[in-house]
A protein has these predicted regions:
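N-terminal loops that bind phosphate or other acidic moieties
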Residues: 2-140, 144-374
């Protein structure tokens, strides 16, 4: 570690996004700006993070200056309207794709848990492969659909047929009519493999499955969740008859079951936060940096179980690295220094009105508190 005797420290600033207000890159910049007003001699390393959901591609792009952005106009959004898909091509030929960008819930005018699909994701994957991508890194999270990744597989060449041999409708509800799947024209995965980044251990079906765990946030009432769960079970049976797959694999329920569909295609489910930490260089900072500053919109008990901030804190503990957590709201006490923007601003409303400013204030407060412990 860098010696604190010299009066300066190495500080890794590695927050998640503050959903609905600031991107991870914006949070990192604001925290660093505030920190520098108190400890101007510290070496600040800005490493915005993500866990596979919103902000995944931007986090990787911020640490890979040689990455090249690609656009795929006219792909099918989750509700059928056209949108533009974006993906990042890294120097080694890996395509980084974020499901939330072209198949995410924010793209919906109104929730449609049974009708929304992942077709756009599949179209972007197909475009990346056609462009020569040698490997895929797909962030799963923030999806609008509960279609098991059926839409993505269809865009990759699979045919989902009812008992009369007709194509079924898009969306999770359409899976109820599924009788067979033709994978004869399914595009092969790239030679370098497919990594599926997820922050959940949800399985495909049942009380701990995609429909029941994530259905409520997509607007599905209890009856709809039951219906979608049965439809996903039908999909699993039909796909399992053609491809090796496991609906009970942890993470299969990610992104409305897209983890299941793309793992059947050949993808490998991996913990998103840990993989992004590796890709961005954060993993190398544990034990090297004197302190890691992380954060998210709300820090609570669930933050410590599989989420990005919990993963960062676990790595800090394992390497005896000091930690700071900055959150819009602290609903639980972090193991190191914890700072709430709502407390600093006097209310959640005030913090949300000027989040960047309060992140700068939090950065300064964090630096002062840390200095007082040295």
């Amino acid at each position: 570690m860098t010696s604190t005797d010299a009066g300066s420290m190495r500080v890794a600033v590695a927050p998640d996004s503050f959903k609905g207000s600031l991107t991870a890159t914006e949070v990192a910049a604001a925290l660093a700006a505030g920190w520098s007003t108190v400890r101007p001699n510290d070496e600040l390393v800005l490493l915005p993070q993500a866990d596979g959901g919103e902000g995944t591609v931007d986090a990787v792009a911020s640490c890979h200056g040689t990455g090249v952005w690609r656009e795929v106009p006219g792909v099918r959004g989750p509700d059928g309207r056209p949108t533009t898909g974006r993906w990042l091509l890294l120097r080694d030929g890996t395509a980084v794709i974020e499901l939330a960008q072209m198949s995410g819930l924010p793209l919906m005018d109104s929730p449609d848990p049974g009708g929304a699909s992942t077709t756009g994701l599949g179209q972007v994957i197909a475009a990346a492969l056609a462009d020569g991508a040698k490997a895929l890194l797909v962030g799963l999270g923030g999806s609008a659909s509960t279609d098991g990744g059926a839409g993505a597989l269809r865009a990759l060449g699979a045919k989902l047929l009812d008992r009369d041999g007709r194509e079924i409708p898009d969306g999770g509800d359409g899976l109820a009519a599924l009788d067979s799947i033709d994978v004869g024209s399914l595009i092969e995965p790239p030679p370098g493999g497919v990594e599926l980044l997820t922050d959940t251990t949800a399985v495909l079906c049942g009380p701990h499955g995609a429909a029941h765990v994530f259905g409520p946030q997509k607007g599905a009432d209890p009856a709809e969740r039951d219906r979608l769960d049965r439809a996903l079970a039908t999909f699993a049976a039909c796909l399992g008859a053609r491809l090796p797959c496991s609906p009970d694999e942890p993470g299969a329920g990610a992104a409305g079951g897209t983890g299941f569909g793309l793992s059947a295609w050949g993808g490998r489910l991996v913990p998103g936060a840990a993989r992004i930490a590796e890709l961005t260089g954060l993993s190398a900072e544990f034990g090297r940096a004197d302190v890691v500053v992380t954060g998210e919109g709300q820090f609570d008990a669930t933050s410590l179980s599989g989420k990005l901030v919990g993963s960062v804190l676990e790595r800090c503990a394992g390497t005896a690295t000091r930690s700071v957590v900055v959150a819009g709201r602290l609903a639980a006490a972090p193991p190191g220094i914890g700072i709430s923007l709502s407390d600093l601003a006097g209310s959640s409303e005030s913090a949300l009105a000027e989040p960047a400013m309060w992140c700068r204030v939090a950065g300064a407060v964090a630096a002062a508190r840390l200095t007082s412990t040295l």
